[in-house]
Amino acid sequence: MIERRRDRQADNFNIDQFGLSTVESLLSAQLAQNTLPVIATGGIASANDVMTSLMLGATITSSAGYMLNTLMTHGEAGLIDEIISWQRALPRLMTLLGARHLSELPSKPRLYASNLQNFINQSKNATP
């Protein structure tokens, strides 16, 4: 949200439409057999997004843009309410997934939407 408020150049280049989504980036890191810590940032706007990122191998997640927007639109009390909501939701999501520890999340079964399955298939078949 903050980035979107910057003045656009005359060519109307929109960085929001360029590159991979957070989920696609995490899947790419998995497909590349990455062994380094991965930070998921950009597009993290819910406890579900945090859980998805952790399941896809993120070591850390960041939702600074979302939280700043919440602070700007709903004030400090709204931000605190949102953080508390996430703190309540994350353990519930882990219970639904049958995970006692964060380290278990990447090994939990998951289903992919058709567009993500297509991304995975094309990425596996891509030549370097």
Predicted regions and their residues:
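Active-site loop ensemble at the mouth of alpha/beta enzyme cores that anchors a bound cofactor
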Residues: M1-F18
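Alpha/beta catalytic cores of nucleotide-metabolism and tRNA/nucleoside-modifying enzymes
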Residues: F13-T35, A45-P128
